[in-house]
Amino acid sequence: MQRIPLKDNRFRIIGYIDIAPNGDKTLRNEKFQILGYYKAKQDVTQDARFMIVGRGDILTSLLRSD
């Protein structure tokens, strides 16, 4: 599994995306709390409660930068 840090315009880490070998992704905030999932096989993005929020990989839209 690969972990990619996400940074804001001040270069602070605001989250992470974990990428599985099959292409599935998990979005986590800076405290490693899960915010959402991308299921590559179904090509859908789900929130932390597994509700579909969109088609395609729109995980970063679930990330809030304060």
Indicate where each model-derived feature is located.
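Intrinsically disordered, low-complexity proline/glycine-rich segments
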Residues: 1-66
